[in-house]
C-alpha cells in the first residue's frame, strides 16, 4: 500500500557552528514530528557516541582508592574525580588506546596538560584542569590507561583492564557531548500554519565537531530503525535461523535485489529483452550467467556490457546464489 507523502525538509540548516557548538534547524516537519525526531536525537547524542577516557590508573605507593599520596594535598578519591574530567581527542587514527607513565616532580601542581606531554595518539582538550597539588619536594609517579568506549562505564566494568593488583579502575565518561537542547516551533507552509520547525543545539567537548556528532547520531538511529523496515522480518520469531534476517548486510541485499530493473538507468533495448524473458528485478538478473543472457532473443554483447557495468557498480555479479536472502518468502 502506498504511503501518503510527508511534508519534510530536503536538508538540515546549520545556523551556527564552531569546534564545540552547533545550532541546527530542521523544517518543515509534520505536526508531532518535531518532538519525535528531537527527543530521539537528543537521547542518542547524550548516550551513544564514542569517545576516549581514562579507564585505569596506578599510583606508585598506593594500593587502593582510599589511600593518600605522600606530599600530595588531595587524597586518591579526589584525584580520581579530577582524572574523570580529562577530555581526549584522537590525533592518530591507529591509536584506540594508550598507556603512559607520568612523573611529576619539582612542581606544585599536576595538570591535565602534563598527561598530554607523554601521549602519542591523543591530545588533551582541557590542559589547565588541575588534578592535584603537590608539596615542593614531592614526587608523584602515575600510570594512566586511555581507552575507547561509548557513553558512561562504571569502574567495576573497567576491572578487565587491571593487569596488576595495584591498578585502580575508575569510572569512564566517554561521551564527547556536553549538552543537547532542542525546541519545537510552529512553521508555516503556504496557508498551513501547523507544521513544525525543530531547532537543535549541540555542545561537544571539542573532540568531535557538532555537525559530525549529529551525523553519527542519525546513523545510529537509521541502523536501528532499518531492522523494522524489511517486509520479511518476523518479529515474534526467536529461533537462531531467524537471526540472519536481522543482519544489516542481509537486509541491504534483500532490498537491493528486489529493485525493479525499470527503475535502473538501462537502455530501452536491454529492458525489452529482459522483460521478454520475465527478468524484472536485480534478483532475477544476477541468477543468470553471461552465456545464458546471450541466448535471449535480440540480446547482444552491447547489452551484456551495459548490464555488467550496472552490476559492478552495485557490487553484484552474474551467477549469484540468492537463496540465502529468502526473497521468495513474502
UniProtKB/Swiss-Prot annotation:
GO terms, biological process: DNA-templated transcription
EC number: 2.7.7.6
Entry keyword annotation includes Transcription: yes
CDD domains, sorted: RNAP_alpha_NTD
Chain intervals for the UniProt region annotation (Alpha C-terminal domain (alpha-CTD)): 248-330
GO molecular function ontology, one term from the record: DNA-directed RNA polymerase activity
Entry keyword Transferase: yes
Keywords of the record: DNA-directed RNA polymerase, Nucleotidyltransferase, Transcription, Transferase
Gene Ontology terms: cellular component: cytoplasm; DNA-directed RNA polymerase complex
Reactions this protein catalyses: RNA(n) + a ribonucleoside 5'-triphosphate = RNA(n+1) + diphosphate
SUPFAM superfamilies: C-terminal domain of RNA polymerase alpha subunit, Insert subdomain of RNA polymerase alpha subunit, RBP11-like subunits of RNA polymerase
Pfam family, one: RNA_pol_A_bac
Alpha N-terminal domain (alpha-NTD): region residues: 1-232
Summary of subunit composition and partner proteins: Homodimer. The RNAP catalytic core consists of 2 alpha, 1 beta, 1 beta' and 1 omega subunit. When a sigma factor is associated with the core the holoenzyme is formed, which can initiate transcription.
Domain remarks in the Swiss-Prot or TrEMBL record: The N-terminal domain is essential for RNAP assembly and basal transcription, whereas the C-terminal domain is involved in interaction with transcriptional regulators and with upstream promoter elements.
Record's function text: DNA-dependent RNA polymerase catalyzes the transcription of DNA into RNA using the four ribonucleoside triphosphates as substrates.
Membership in a protein family: Belongs to the RNA polymerase alpha chain family.
Protein name: DNA-directed RNA polymerase subunit alpha
Gene for this chain: rpoA
Amino acid at each position: 500500500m502506498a504511503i501518503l507523502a510527508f511534508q519534510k525538509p530536503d536538508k538540515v540548516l546549520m545556523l551556527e557552528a564552531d569546534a564545540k557548538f552547533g545550532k541546527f534547524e530542521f523544517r518543515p516537519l509534520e505536526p508531532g514530528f518535531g518532538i519525535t525526531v528531537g527527543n530521539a536525537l537528543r537521547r542518542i547524542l547524550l548516550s551513544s557516541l564514542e569517545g576516549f577516557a581514562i579507564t585505569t590508573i596506578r599510583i606508585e605507593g598506593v594500593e587502593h582508592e582510599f589511600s593518600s599520596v605522600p606530599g600530595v594535598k588531595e587524597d586518591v578519591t579526589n584525584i580520581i574525580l579530577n582524572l574523570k574530567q580529562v577530555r581526549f581527542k584522537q590525533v592518530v587514527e591507529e591509536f584506540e588506546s594508550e598507556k603512559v607513565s607520568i612523573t611529576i616532580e619539582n612542581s606544585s601542581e599536576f595538570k591535565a596538560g602534563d598527561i598530554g606531554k607523554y601521549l602519542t595518539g591523543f591530545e588533551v582538550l582541557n590542559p589547565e584542569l588541575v588534578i592535584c597539588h603537590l608539596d615542593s619536594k614531592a614526587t608523584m609517579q602515575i600510570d594512566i590507561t586511555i581507552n575507547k568506549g561509548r557513553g558512561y562505564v562504571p569502574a567495576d566494568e573497567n576491572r578487565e583492564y587491571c593487569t596488576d593488583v595495584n591498578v585502580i579502575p575508575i569510572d569512564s565518561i566517554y561521551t564527547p557531548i556536553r549538552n543537547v537542547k532542542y525546541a519545537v516551533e510552529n512553521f508555516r507552509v503556504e496557508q498551513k500554519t501547523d507544521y513544525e520547525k525543530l531547532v537543535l543545539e549541540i555542545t561537544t567537548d571539542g573532540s568531535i565537531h557538532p555537525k559530525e556528532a549529529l551525523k553519527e547520531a542519525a546513523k545510529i538511529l537509521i541502523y536501528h530503525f532499518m531492522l523494522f523496515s524489511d517486509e520479511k522480518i518476523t518479529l515474534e520469531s526467536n529461533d537462531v535461523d531467524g537471526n540472519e534476517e536481522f543482519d544489516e548486510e542481509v537486509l541491504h541485499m534483500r532490498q537491493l535485489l528486489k529493485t525493479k530493473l525499470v527503475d535502473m538507468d538501462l537502455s530501452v533495448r536491454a529492458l525489452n529483452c529482459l522483460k521478454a524473458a520475465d527478468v524484472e528485478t536485480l534478483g532475477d538478473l544476477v541468477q543468470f550467467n553471461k552465456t545464458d543472457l546471450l541466448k535471449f532473443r535480440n540480446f547482444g554483447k552491447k547489452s551484456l556490457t551495459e548490464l555488467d557495468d550496472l552490476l559492478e557498480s552495485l557490487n553484484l555479479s552474474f551467477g549469484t546464489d540468492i537463496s540465502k536472502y529468502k526473497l521468495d518468502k513474502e
